[in-house]
Each structure stands twice: as structure tokens, then as C-alpha cells.
Amino acid sequence: MTKPRYNDVLFDDDDSVPSESVTRKSQRRKATSPGESRESSKDRLLILPSMGESYTEYVDSYLNLELLERGERETPIFLESLTRQLTQKIYELIKTKSLTADTLQQISDKYDGVVAENKLLFLQRQYYVDDEGNVRDGRNNDKIYCEPKHVYDMVMATHLMNKHLRGKTLHSFLFSHFANISHAIIDWVQQFCSKCNKKGKIKPLKEYKRPDMYDKLLPMERIHIEVFEPFNGEAIEGKYSYVLLCRDYRSSFMWLLPLKSTKFKHLIPVVSSLFLTFARVPIFVTSSTLDKDDLYDICEEIASKYGLRIGLGLKSSARFHTGGILCIQYALNSYKKECLADWGKCLRYGPYRFNRRRNKRTKRKPVQVLLSEVPGHNAKFETKRERVIENTYSRNMFKMAGGKGLIYLEDVNTFALANEADNSCNNNGILHNNNIGNDNFEEEVQKQFDLTEKNYIDEYDDLAHDSSEGEFEPNTLTPEEKPPHNVDEDRIESTGVAAPMQGTEEPEKGDQKESDGASQVDQSVEITRPETSYYQTLESPSTKRQKLDQQGNGDQTRDFGTSMEL
């Protein structure tokens, strides 16, 4: 006899059960063939099984039962290889309220002495048992923690009950109810469905490693700067309502500076001091909260005044940017009273803590990655900058007055160059770029650089987790292995005749037909085609500002325009 099913029912996020007023029993779903068409998941309500309900109640006759049983056997082993997942024994200790340092030492040899005390503090701060006996994750919106031994049943049953729902939709639905259902678990479980995995190839059972999206970058090669209000209008020390966050892509090392307002007279000195104190001026700067015109004007002012060469990068990592903002807001608001009274406390609980905690993406501390002693690192960095500038289209380079400073914009050439391996050039020093002339360049950028939900978990989850657990985590990291220095690496010479670098250069005739349909909502830096200039007008921003000054209407302390709303 089959168990009751719930159709056309909305579920509560807290209790994960259907409302009693609309609960009804329905007949078992008829077996569907693999080739039968099904309605879109957006046009139907999804069904959630109860915790502990077996998936076998919903197995159709055409499915490979042996493959399903194999997944049931191997999933507990797979879960033990994941980070931020409770083991079944620890889950039972939390649920029965018998979690102590002694019980932790009894269930595992790795919890001994101080390690057991530290683990106990972390578990007590994050997990608790509600009045109904459910274990909840206090750092993940108080969502229910699915019991480890029922994870496979929960995912597979939901997959089968909802007509083989899979991928991001399945993860989004289950993660809205349970705190521990990750993308890795979804990908692992759904491969044991013979309808979705017709070839029957199963990933080897080994430790799951999350990909490092920026492992090809050098430290300080690419940064992003964001301006936001950490306390929704409340001023730190009664003076600073805003903060400026700067974070390195490769190492996730972050800097935090106070801001009185978002006017140019306050923002430009802060950004200038940041750039001038860097050991290396970054090759590319990006932002998701600053309007692209404002970002250009800020960098233009700094480059012209101090003779720096600054590159403005593609908007390719909005989720990475947002994750850094959210983790800082989370950390500072956890100590809101102290941080509002003392700016030093903001640094202590924000960048000071995160820069010294092990990062799940890089597997090391940000400070270790940033300050790692790599042979020839400085030479590689400067060589890469020169190669990027030499391969940038002349229309995307703007020389400052006097020839001291330079602004260059990332395009198809430099994007490929920044992400290439060390040996991607031939013996003649000519860059092989398969993206030249590619009309779908924006799509290729998203495939290579975008942080999709499938292959990357939000940086906010990493840093928020590290901020609590890492505070009591002993330093067990090993020194970084130093790669051999490539003494044969040469600088690429310019292969073409350089055109005059002027911001007002008119495009070629073939470029005048390019589309001007860029989104007006997204104000971040985004170059969608090689021929597309940073501005869609032929007038450079410096020219526009000079005209405003001549008319007497130029306000150098104006507020910023459209910013991304968090």
C-alpha cells in the first residue's frame, strides 16, 4: 500500500509540511515512461516528502533498482567527505542533547583535548533543537537540518515524486527547507537515477573538492571595490555611514576603509590611499555597487594625478562581489554595538578575522596566499601587466594629460590573456586567441568566469562559516609548495601597429553599426564585444566633466548614480 501523496499544496518554509486546511490524500501517481512529456516545473507545485520517508515507494518499473540501491549504500560515505556536514553520530548527540566534550572524544579519535572543546563551542553556537525535536541550523536562517541517514531518501524521493526534477531547481526547492542539502549532494544522488543517467557512469567515490574559480590569477592581479552601508544608515563613531570594501580575487584577502559619504570629495582620497599603499597596483579593478561611469571617473582622477596605470575589468563575478559584502555585513552586525562605537572593532571582527581564517575555496588562509613567496612572482606580475596593455585595443586605452597616467579597459584580447596558462603563447610571442571575432564573447565570459550555482557555493557561506569555526580552529596548515620558476618566460612584443591612444578616437566604419542595447539596469562594468568601447558615446568622460566645469554646473562632490541594491 502506498503512502499518501500531497498534490497542489504549498509548503511552509519552517515546518516543511502541508497546511492542514488544504491537505488531502490522492492516488498514487501513474508510472510514466522515460519518453513521456512532462510539464514545466515552473507551471506546477512541487511535492516534498516527509523526513524518513523511503524513496522506494515512488520507484517506477523501468528504473534500475540495483543502481538506486548502490546510491543508498555509498551516499553515507560520500557525505563524510564533505565539509560543513554533520556525521550521524554528532547529529544524534545534538538531537538527544547529550553533546559534550567527553562524548565527542568517545565517537572519534580526532576530537581530543582542546580540539574537542573548540568543536563543542562551534557546534553549540550553530545548532540547536527546537520544541518539536528538530535539529536546526542557527546560522542558516534556522532551517531544519536533514538527518544524515535520511539525506539520500529525501533527495531521491523528491526527485522521483516531482517527475525527475533535477539540477538547480531541485537544489533550490530542497535548500529552502533543509540547511544541509548542497549542490554536491544533488549532483551525487541524481546520478543513481537510470532515467537521468542513461549511460550509468558513476563518479568515483573520493573526497569532493570544490573548484577554485580563480586559481589561474596572480595575487593582486584582479580586485573589486564596493561601497555600502553596513548598518543601514547608522554611523560608525558618529562619522562614517559607509565603508569601502576591497577584496583580491585570488586570495580573498580584504581591506576595509571608512567613508563619510559617497561623494567624490570623500571617496577619491580613500581609493587613492588604498592604491598608493598596495605592494602592486592591480591589473584590473571591478565593482558591482559603483556605477561604471563613476568608477571610470574615480580611476581617471587617480591615474592622472598620481601617474598610475589602472585597468577596468569586465563585470564577471557579481555573486563573488555580493558574497564579500554580505559576509562583512554579517560579521559587523554580529557585534553591532561594539563596531558602532569603535572603528577598530570593525577591523577586528571584519577583515582581521577573515584574512586569518582558512578559506574553503583556496584551502588556505587569505594572508598566506597573498604573501606567498613564489619564485619570480614579481617578474611574472609585471610581465603580465605589460602583455595585457600591449594586447589591448587602442580604442579601449585612454592616456591622461601629460602622458603620465593610463586607463585601459578589458576586452576579448586581455580577458583571454589574463586567464591563459603560462605556456599559451608560441615561440614567436604571438598570443593565440580563439575568441577574436567571436560574436558570442559575452557568453564565453560567463562560461569561464561566472560563479554559477552549480559549481560554486556563495563566498558568503564560506566566510560566515569560517568566521565562527576558524576562531577556535588550530593552525594545521602546511607551507605552500613552491612551483618551479620558469626562466624561459619572455614578454610578448606588440604584433601590430599601435594607433594613437585617445579616448575620443572614432571607431571604424564597421564598428558604427554595433548595438547600443546594453541593459540600463545593470550599471556595472561590462564590455560585451571586442569592438565595444567602455562608453557608448564618442565623448570621453573627462571631456564631459570639462564642459560641466566651464558652464559652472560641475559638482565634483555629487552623489553616486544607480548602485546595485542589496
From Swiss-Prot:
KW Zinc-finger (keyword) present: yes
Keywords: DNA recombination, DNA replication, DNA-binding, Metal-binding, Nucleus, Zinc, Zinc-finger
Region named Disordered: 1-44, 466-566
UniProt keyword annotation of Zinc-finger present: yes
Record localization: Nucleus, Nucleolus
Biased composition, class Basic and acidic residues, residue ranges: 479-493, 506-516
Compositionally biased residues, Polar residues: 517-555
Effect seen on changing C193A: Abolishes RFB-binding, replication fork blocking activity and reduces recombination rate
GO terms for cellular component: nucleolus; rDNA heterochromatin
GO molecular function: rDNA spacer replication fork barrier binding; zinc ion binding
Recorded consequence of changing H164A: Abolishes RFB-binding, replication fork blocking activity and reduces recombination rate
UniProt main location, coarse: nucleus
Zinc finger (C2H2-type): 159-196
GO annotation (BP), single: maintenance of DNA repeat elements
Other comment: Present with 1510 molecules/cell in log phase SD medium.
Subunit: Interacts with NSI1.
Task of the protein: Required for replication fork blocking activity at the replication fork barrier (RFB) site in rDNA and for recombination hot-spot (HOT1) activity, regulating the recombination rate and the number of rDNA copies. Binds directly to two separated sequences in the RFB.
Record-given protein name: DNA replication fork-blocking protein FOB1
